[in-house]
């Protein structure tokens, strides 16, 4: 596993994209999974789309990274629905469902909904977003008709080894009731999340288990002690890597027992112009039969568009 050179906690250490080599492998010798930060399709990003089209949001460098992967997971930070039933909260977002087709055309295969904005247009808007993602040829993650469905781990790949993603929102939702039998996003207690990871590991010792958490304090550069504790517990339960988001900043990467913990990879397609919010990264996992290579790809966001640094 390629990690920042430390046995404990480090600042983010990037791998130069130009040095990354994709082997000319035969089918199933290697699976490449790329994970990105927050994707917003409203507010300032909506203005860019109205002026230039959705395709403008994907730079050549990002397209190249996506093209090299079999699986690309983005965190969709808004509902994509025609339903307008806003929840009473400070920031309310909504993207157009027809824009999802372009996300798929540029290589995104899975969209995570286990975040604090997927419910911005209510439960009906959440389920409609889920249906719209499926209709666009992508897989929705972390949302369902009830908590049991929403919290199910998602199988990203089967060869050369199974790759699972376990999503979870670790924040309280603003003015939104926690009802486990109603449409919702994955928001189980930590004990349940640990049990999911532990069961996956017990079922298959060779599987790659990715945990994706939406958590942390916005605009901060370091996680709080409770996050570190929970992250360590997830690794001990069997997770191989944690790739998290929500803070709109690039936070510390920790090497815990040889496992990478990305406490926040920052934004991806977003409209926050401050330098603090414009530095981000993607995470690329190369899964082979005999190993897992974790690579950090630096990103700079300019006028809502992510560029490879």
Predicted feature residues:
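Acidic, metal/ion-coordinating pockets
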Residues: 2-309
């Amino acid at each position: 596993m390629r990690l920042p050179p430390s046995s404990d906690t480090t600042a983010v250490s990037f791998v130069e994209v130009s040095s990354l080599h994709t082997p000319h492998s035969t089918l199933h010798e290697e699976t490449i999974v790329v994970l990105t930060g927050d994707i917003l399709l409203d507010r300032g990003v909506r203005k860019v789309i109205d002026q230039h089209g959705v395709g403008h949001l994907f730079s050549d460098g990002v397209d190249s990274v996506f093209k090299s992967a079999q699986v690309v997971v983005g965190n969709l930070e808004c509902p994509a629905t025609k339903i307008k039933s806003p929840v009473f909260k400070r920031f309310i977002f909504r993207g157009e469902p027809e824009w999802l087709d372009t996300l798929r055309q540029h290589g995104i295969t899975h969209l995570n909904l286990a975040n604090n904005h997927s419910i911005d247009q209510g439960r009906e808007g959440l389920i409609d977003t889920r249906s719209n993602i499926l209709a666009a040829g992508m897989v929705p993650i972390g949302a369902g008709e009830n908590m049991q469905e929403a919290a199910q781990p998602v199988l990203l790949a089967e060869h050369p080894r199974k790759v699972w993603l376990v999503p979870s929102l670790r924040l309280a939702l603003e003015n939104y009731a926690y009802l486990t039998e109603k449409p919702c996003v994955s928001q189980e207690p930590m004990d349940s999340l640990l049990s999911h990871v532990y069961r996956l590991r017990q079922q298959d010792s060779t599987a790659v288990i990715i945990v994706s958490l939406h958590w942390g304090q916005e605009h901060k550069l370091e996680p709080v002690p409770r996050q570190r504790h929970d992250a360590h517990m997830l690794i001990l339960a069997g997770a191989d890597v944690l790739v998290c988001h929500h803070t709109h900043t690039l936070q510390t990467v920790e090497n815990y027992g040889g496992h990478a913990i990305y406490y926040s990879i920052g934004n991806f397609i977003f409209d926050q112009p401050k330098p603090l919010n414009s530095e981000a990264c993607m995470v690329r996992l190369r899964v082979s039969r005999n190993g897992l290579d974790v690579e950090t790809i630096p990103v700079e966001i300019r006028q809502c568009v992510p560029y490879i640094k």
